[in-house]
From Swiss-Prot:
GO MF terms held by the record: metal ion binding
Organism of derivation: Oryza sativa subsp. japonica
Superkingdom assignment: Eukaryota
Name of this protein: Protein PYRICULARIA ORYZAE RESISTANCE 21
Task performed by this protein: Involved in defense responses. Contributes to slowing defense responses toward Magnaporthe oryzae.
Outcome of gene disruption: The pi21 allele confers an improved non-race-specific blast resistance toward Magnaporthe oryzae. Reduced salicylic acid (SA) responses (e.g. WRKY45 expression) but increased systemic acquired response (SAR, e.g. PR1b and PBZ1 accumulation), jasmonic acid (JA, e.g. JAmyb expression) and abscisic acid (ABA, e.g. SalT expression) responses in response to M.oryzae spores.
Chain ranges of the HMA domain: 1-68
UniProt entry keywords in alphabetical sequence: Metal-binding, Plant defense
Biased composition, class Basic and acidic residues, residue ranges: 142-156
Amino acid sequence: MGILVILVDLQCCRCDAKIRKVLGCLEEEYCIEKVEYDVKNNRVIVRGKFDPEKLCKKIWCKAGKIIKEILIVDVWPPPLPQPPPPCKPPPCEKPPEDCKPKPCHCCSCEKPKPKPKPCHCEKPKPCHCEKPKPCEKPPPCKPEEPPKPPPEKPPPKPECKLVPYPYPVPYPYAGQWCCPKPEPPKPPPEPPKEPEPPKPCGCSHAFVCVCKPAPPPPPPCGCSGGHGNCGCGIRPWPPQVWPPPPVCPPPPWCYTEDNANACSIM
């Protein structure tokens, strides 16, 4: 029959619950018959038909953090120590008149020590010190503020970039034509020549022939010299052509809507 004495702090509720749970799990496996809990002395006595060394190792493995010590004993509670035998003086071989008992040097026969005398010192005077003030309550813990997000960076200012532009060569100046000068308009065509007078018919009339009547003169065309829709057969003048509009150069700098007075550099 094996007996184990386990030293545990049974005043602690967690340690008490832990050792009860461990011993309850090992009760059937190791044939534990009886478990006694001595709360005053913080001891647990385990009895049963088991191998004490194996059960001791198992309990150390399961609850080693709360156990102070495990004792393997044969008998519990341990037997009380027997009182020492009374000291008997050795028999005296001399006559009883000369025989005196020798002093005994055993522990039980020694004379008791005298009791200490009562102290006649003066009683300590009561202390007139001020009572200690109660401790101030600590201020309540403030909840930790969440970390503030980093400030947002301002958006970058728009940069003004110059875009290459193919300038005409030579560079056009204001008030001048960007294209070659137009050719002057051609003069109007000459009016048709009048037909030559008919040759004389060979008669005796010197200046005017009366033999044949003279052909009638051609009717006026009424085109006022332009010959636009006239049927006189003369081509009309070409229409007037205006010079092409000048080519304006691109602006030398780009334009932004930012306030120019906001920054001294701008």
